[in-house]
Amino acid sequence: KDNNLIKDYKASAAEAMKKDDGNFFTKYGNFFLKGIQNTILISIVGVLLGTVFGAGIALLKLSKIKLLSWLASAYIEFLRGTPLLVQVFLVYFGTTAVLGLNISALICGMIALVINCSAYIAEIIRAGINAVDSGQTEAARSLGLTYGQTMKSVILPQAIKNILPALGNEFVTVIKESSIVSVIGVSEIMFNAQVVQGASFDPFTPLIVAAILYFILTFTLSRVMYYFEGRMKVSD
């Protein structure tokens, strides 16, 4: 299925090459637009779901139950200690070749990014929770709040505020790292740049366009994060 998709992309790019208007962006602009859409989609899914799973893993690591804490630590250390490229291949070939599931390359790429993000975000959240004064936990417990209520009403709201800049940086990192999923045929920016390279016989221009697009996405996101950081400081 994915191989057919790749052939379709290459056929479309070759067809675009036959256009005689001589304008690179008129010929291949749609490929880069499609790449931008998928890059943004993959990154958003990776960060959002990674945050959800990462929060759970962070709480497990902070658990007083040693087995749960050890398992969470092992999960985090393994994913942080192995390349994302290897993780992408493990998910892709593990789901398709080993388990025999018919899952698209796009979904496999998303799963790999979510798993990878969850490990890094778990550490961010854990650090944010530990940064909250322990006296607040003791005060909340003395008022009769349970551990769960203390986390929900006292600790996490402060921790989230503390970790927002780090989460923004993780989002920027994921946008750049999403290029790795091109190796399994996901049509994000880098994959489509390679398709255009093959169709146009121009090895340089598509890479320059891809680099500019990644820069625009990451720079825009960074500016947005700086804006919200400034608003948060004013509110304090």
Spans of model-derived segments:
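Transmembrane alpha-helices and adjacent helix-loop boundaries
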Residues: 2-236
